[in-house]
Amino acid sequence: MLGADIEHYLAELVARLDDALGDRLVGVWLFGSGALGDLDPATSDLDVQVVTTVRLPRAERERLAARVSHPELPCPVRGLELVVYACDDLRDALGPAFQLNLNTGPRMTQHAAYDPAEDPRFWFVLDVAIGRDAGRPLAGPPPAEVFPELPAPLVLASLREALAWFAANDRKGDQAALAAARAWAWAE
């Protein structure tokens, strides 16, 4: 359990997603530190993955982003990282291709991307590689029933890209060390 305020937030998030998507919603899963048991509300994000049966029109994705963005839905931790995929896009040769990547919250910069070319793909490869086994269902089946097992060479290339990104962008090394530990755990 993540605490009553976080659990309530996740329940409201799922309710809004279900209301907006209806029978096109395959499921909603908590990935990342929230699922792995090391969430720190001051510094962590809630990493939530959503899968739909079909690709949604851009205007609908924009409305969905507005409906779940902070402060419309106040986030009780640093932020929400919400990624929405269509089933068919999970098996893209370059790695899972999102239809919405939303970062929103009281202590993070608002970011919404609607094309997988807008953000580095390695983030999504690593999230799916780890989360398919360690994710927590918020609605729908266990993640391994929906998220594919990704090819090891793709995941290893993504790990190298992530470590290079952290070397260039995380001068203190805090997040790089955490990412390296998670990568090591996946590799074992």
What are these regions (language model features)?
Residues 11, 15, 66-69, 185:
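Surface-exposed alpha-helical segments enriched in charged/polar residues
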Residues 160-188:
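Hydrophobic alpha-helical packing segments in soluble, helical-rich domains
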Residues 1-29, 59-61:
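Helical scaffold of the NTase/Pol beta-like nucleotidyltransferase catalytic core
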Residues 30-66, 70, 79-84:
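Catalytic metal-binding acidic patch
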Residues 1, 66-170:
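Conserved NTP/Mg2+-binding pocket subregion across the NTase superfamily
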Residues 35-36, 89, 182-185:
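Short, solvent-exposed loop/turn segments at secondary-structure junctions
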